[in-house]
Regions:
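A sequence-level/structural motif corresponding to short, flexible coil/turn segments enriched
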Residues: 20-229
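Bacterial Sec-dependent N-terminal signal peptides
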Residues: 1-25
Length: 229
């Protein structure tokens, strides 16, 4: 019995060693001096397409040049950058305004999808210059500073913005109707946590509070629900 156990252990050890291939770094890129140290985000989402191109995202407060084009910031903006298989800078676009990209994915054709949160007014950049603007949550007609509105955007392989959807929550009508409910920032929001592309459709999971309406669909959170759509 001892010999059998010893042989099994050795075999497992050999398999473990063999399963660790040598990794060679093909290329490395970085963007410097675009965000204060106090606000550095070390978990920015990235994605690699079926074609081998890499899409990188992040936060920035200072303008920088990428692929020969200046990427400009307003407040703490977000960027979406595309690198070729050899690390060449292909294109970059900005989400100009207070925004954070939280998740990213691609489809088989190399289109890229991003989702996250934003506040106030957000401009979605496009390499063809046809930007789109979305407004976030307001209270008493004034935009709130909290990044509580959600968004999903699609760019094609050339960085052309193809579609944008925003998810802007508001108080539950039945609570407002009581006359004794006075909402505060944070009482209602829409957070898209993850997205995935499969069989021609984009799927997303989200957590939300309050009432959010989009394209005929209603997401009613009674103050804190989780849904997948």
């Amino acid at each position: 019995m001892k010999k059998v156990l010893l042989l099994a252990f050795c075999a497992a050890a050999m398999l473990t060693v063999q399963a660790q291939p040598t990794v060679t770094n093909s290329w490395t890129k970085s963007q410097t001096d675009i965000l204060s140290v106090a606000n550095v985000n070390n978990s920015n989402p990235v994605a690699v397409s079926a074609q081998g191109d890499m899409y990188a995202t992040g936060l920035f407060t200072e303008s920088f040049t990428f692929g020969g084009k200046e990427i400009e910031a307003v407040a703490t903006s977000s960027y979406l950058l595309k690198y070729g298989t050899d690390g060449a800078e292909k294109w970059g676009v900005a989400l100009t305004g207070a925004a954070t990209i939280k998740t990213i994915t691609t489809d088989g054709a190399g289109n890229v999808y991003i989702a996250g949160n934003f506040a106030d007014e957000l401009t979605f950049g496009s390499t063809d210059g046809n930007t789109q603007v979305k407004e976030g949550i307001k209270m008493d007609g004034t935009p709130i500073a909290d990044q509580a509105a959600g968004f999903v955007a699609k760019d094609d392989v050339n960085g052309v913005l193809k579609a944008v959807q925003s998810f802007v929550s508001k108080p539950l009508p039945e609570l407002e109707a009581t006359g004794i409910y006075f909402p505060e920032a944070g009482d209602y929001r829409f957070d898209i946590n993850n997205i995935a592309y499969s069989d021609g459709k984009l799927y997303a999971s989200a957590s939300y509070k309050g009432l959010t309406e989009n394209n005929g669909f209603s997401f009613k959170g009674g103050y804190f629900d989780l849904d997948v759509w």
